[in-house]
């Protein structure tokens, strides 16, 4: 019987695909352990385009109102329009040239992308929404040689009511994960998160942050893959602990209304600014249901709404309008 192959000898794209499928199972099982309903699997393919994925969806539970943990593995041709939009961040990304004319070809660039994307919206207004996404992307030249590659991702917390100890725990465990690789990473990725999840027209962040990085190719890909795995491993110990603290707390209709207003902000960011949403909707054969899985079941927009000064609602806005440091 031949010896099992060392996973590190496989292409990075295969290692990343195996990682996200394993983490999808771990995360859904962990979240199910504190709810009365189970995730159901929705497997999809891209039709004539390459690849597909599995969306694990939970809805109408006693703990989680709506949530999804989606794995996608897609490949095919990246359109010239998509290449043009992305090449500013990737100098090696370019349209191949026709050897006869020397002009860029019109059928795009071959690509592979895989990732796990998750958003969870709890029932209780005191339990925070969370988002997690880790992904890998690569392109090839027409002859099959690699052209460019990068990782992206992160995890963040979006509470309706601020609990200092929750923010500290979430940030500390993700800092610990990054510190294993370089103590300079957490401050950089924390700042990146605050800047990325910013709702410009509201002049506030979407939540209280976490970590975020994109177009990341500064280290050996094997090292980045291990960093991503360590960040994955920080998620359940932090988020499950927080939700267990909050899921059975009493709440009022007024607190539910504030939760719906804050979820309106979530919708605004995801539909207007989020790069992943925009990329997904531009990709031929992409699945709209999976892309918009992040949207909450209920959201609200009240005209010219402002919380009372000194209220708990106003305290949250102090943090979203001026991001703070959560750990030393």
Swiss-Prot record:
Complex and partners: Homodimer.
UniProt subcellular location: Cytoplasm
Reactions this protein catalyses: coproporphyrinogen III + O2 + 2 H(+) = protoporphyrinogen IX + 2 CO2 + 2 H2O
EC numbers for this chain: 1.3.3.3
Residues involved in substrate binding: 117, 133-135, 285-290
Cellular component terms (Gene Ontology): cytoplasm; cytosol
Matching NCBIfam families: PRK05330.1
Active site (UniProt): 131
Pathway where this protein functions: Porphyrin-containing compound metabolism; protoporphyrin-IX biosynthesis; protoporphyrinogen-IX from coproporphyrinogen-III (O2 route): step 1/1
Family the entry assigns: Belongs to the aerobic coproporphyrinogen-III oxidase family.
Taxonomy, superkingdom: Eukaryota
Note: Present with 22000 molecules/cell in log phase SD medium.
Name used for this protein in its record: Oxygen-dependent coproporphyrinogen-III oxidase
Pfam family, one: Coprogen_oxidas
Record InterPro entries: Coprogen_oxidase_aer, Coprogen_oxidase_aer_sf, Coprogen_oxidase_CS
Region ranges (Important for dimerization): 57-66, 266-302
Principal subcellular localization: cytoplasm
pH dependence: Optimum pH is 7.6.
Sorted UniProt keywords: Cytoplasm, Disulfide bond, Heme biosynthesis, Oxidoreductase, Porphyrin biosynthesis
Residues carrying the site annotation Important for dimerization: 201
Any one Gene Ontology BP term: protoporphyrinogen IX biosynthetic process
Organism the protein comes from: Saccharomyces cerevisiae (strain ATCC 204508 / S288c) (Baker's yeast)
Function per UniProt: Involved in the heme biosynthesis. Catalyzes the aerobic oxidative decarboxylation of propionate groups of rings A and B of coproporphyrinogen-III to yield the vinyl groups in protoporphyrinogen-IX.
GO MF annotation, one: protein homodimerization activity
